[in-house]
């Protein structure tokens, strides 16, 4: 005969809801979104920090390549211009107007003393499709190209010893070191529009930089008018501005800057028997 289940053997919870209610699902999704946002912030910061570190490595490598070039060639390379596709760009004439050329003239005048790192001339990588060295942000914008500025010291007028063939040896270290118009590097914290000839009231980090190599950082594509004075001080690409700003990243400054002092340059060339 059929077996009949007693009431004690049947489901004691006939009204139990199977699965989650909409309210419970919403609470779970809210918790997940909060956890994701908490995790995402450190990850974003880590990615940004890694890009800064990588950019610093690239800039330091570039500085070593520049020193190596100076040791082998007896001079510093001129910066690349916006149209020289990663190759050093010069002026045909040592004075007056500048007709650009990629052929080294005897006077050594650079067409863009504050231009781009000449990655093709130096043989370094990584580079963009036009041959310009790039920082670690690599979003395809021209602003991601690594910048490079070189001292335009003249002796005599119309001759640029630091970038002329064997110009450093010819001009002598004493003459070059005695000049007061090499590149300046200032500490961050500018409260007024930066000068183009000195650090003004800002702390001076160097008055004898032979070259400055730098990246405009994460916000390199931001309109210059939106940047603080510290970053504006590094924006005069193509000009004869000899003043730059360097410091740790903060809320208004994220440029990555290093420089090559005359003393280090001279020391490395002396070690290689290229000077005096």
What kind of feature is each model-predicted range?
Residues 16-46:
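N-terminal single-pass transmembrane signal-anchor helix
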Residues 1-20, 47:
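N-terminal leader/signal peptides at the extreme start of proteins
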Residues 45-276:
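N-terminal pilin/flagellin-like segments and related low-complexity appendage regions
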């Amino acid at each position: 005969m059929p077996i009949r289940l007693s009431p004690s053997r049947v489901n004691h919870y006939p009204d139990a809801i199977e699965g989650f209610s909409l309210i419970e699902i919403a609470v779970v999704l809210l918790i997940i979104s909060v956890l994701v946002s908490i995790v995402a912030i450190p990850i974003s910061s880590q990615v940004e920090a890694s890009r800064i570190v990588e950019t610093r490595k690239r800039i330091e490598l570039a500085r070593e390549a520049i020193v190596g070039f100076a040791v082998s060639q007896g001079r510093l390379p001129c910066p690349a211009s916006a149209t020289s596709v990663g190759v050093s760009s010069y002026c045909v004439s040592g004075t007056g107007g500048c007709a650009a050329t990629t052929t080294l003239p005897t006077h050594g005048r650079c067409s863009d003393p504050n231009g781009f790192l000449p990655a093709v001339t130096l043989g370094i990588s990584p580079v963009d499709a036009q041959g310009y060295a790039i920082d670690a942000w690599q979003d395809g914008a021209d602003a991601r190209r690594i910048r490079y500025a070189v001292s335009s010291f003249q002796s005599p007028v119309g001759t640029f010893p630091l970038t002329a063939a064997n110009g450093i040896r010819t001009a002598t270290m004493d003459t070059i070191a005695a000049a007061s118009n090499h590149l300046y590097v200032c500490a961050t914290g500018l409260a007024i529009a930066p000068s183009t000839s000195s650090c003004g009231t800002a702390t001076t980090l160097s008055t004898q930089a032979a070259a400055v190599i730098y990246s405009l950082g994460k916000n390199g594509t931001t309109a210059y008018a939106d940047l603080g004075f510290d970053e504006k001080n590094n924006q005069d690409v193509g000009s004869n501005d000899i003043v730059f700003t360097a410091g740790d990243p903060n809320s208004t400054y994220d440029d990555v800057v290093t420089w090559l002092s005359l003393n280090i340059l001279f020391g490395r060339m002396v070690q290689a028997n290229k000077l005096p």
